Amino acid sequence: MEEKKALIIVDVQKAFDDKKWGERNNVKAEENISKILELWREKGWTVIYIQHTSDKPHSLFHPKNEGFAIKEIVKPMDEEVIITKTVNSSFIGTNLEEFLKLNEITTVVITGLTTPHCVSTTTRMSGNLGFDTYLISDATAAFGMRDQNDTYYDAATIHNISLATLHDEFATILTTDQLINDFIKTH
């Protein structure tokens, strides 16, 4: 029997277009997610959207603010699942794990924003919960950040270090092309 798969699209929301986040890497991440999404839908495999929400009225992620909306380039279809979350992990305080298990999904492919935060936390938990987890390196992105000593790390460095901490221990890291050629087209 073929293993059931789910594509998880984490927090691809308009809030991340705000200039407050600063410099970003992988400007084509959403384009790559869209490519994967199109092929995933053709296969009839499960698509799950994760949408971050905040109860703080001034937050970009508050449901009344435009930033809460999922970006048009990866717009969900009516029958696709949207799970809202309030913390970094897509598994905490949501029914994601239950949904995956009820639908006998054992393999998950994770994409979305941002690599060091919600994508990383979701990937770690997915791996810890025993799912066969894949993270798509060019279908995620990071912003530059400062550490506790005010040292600045550019977006590419943050992204690459985040991927390095996940590689092999929590997930298999693939590019969009690798996923399409070695995973989607062979299943």
UniProtKB/Swiss-Prot annotation:
Gene3D superfamilies noted in UniProt: Isochorismatase-like (3.40.50.850)
Stretch forming the signal peptide: none
NAD in keyword set: no
Record GO terms (molecular function): hydrolase activity
Enzyme class: hydrolase
Keywords: Hydrolase
The EC number(s) this enzyme carries: 3.-.-.-
Family named by the database record: Belongs to the isochorismatase family.
Name by which UniProt lists this protein: Uncharacterized isochorismatase family protein YrdC
Organism: Bacillus subtilis (strain 168)
